[in-house]
Amino acid sequence: RLKVIPEKLKDVKLVCTDVFGDN
């Protein structure tokens, strides 16, 4: 789990989906 800035929340969501593949 990474601590990210709310501003990059959208990017984080995409990254999490790409890394975790949770879709």
From Swiss-Prot:
Keywords: Glycosyltransferase, Transferase. One of its GO terms (molecular function) is uridine phosphorylase activity. Pathway: Pyrimidine metabolism; UMP biosynthesis via salvage pathway; uracil from uridine (phosphorylase route): step 1/1. One of its GO terms (biological process) is UMP salvage. It comes from the Bacteria. It is an enzyme of class 2 (transferase). It catalyses: uridine + phosphate = alpha-D-ribose 1-phosphate + uracil. Coiled coil: none annotated. Its EC number is 2.4.2.3. Homotetramer. Belongs to the PNP/UDP phosphorylase family. The enzymes which catalyze the reversible phosphorolysis of pyrimidine nucleosides are involved in the degradation of these compounds and in their utilization as carbon and energy sources, or in the rescue of pyrimidine bases for nucleotide synthesis. This is Uridine phosphorylase. It comes from Lacticaseibacillus rhamnosus (Lactobacillus rhamnosus). The lineage of its organism: Bacteria, Bacillati, Bacillota, Bacilli, Lactobacillales. The gene is udp.
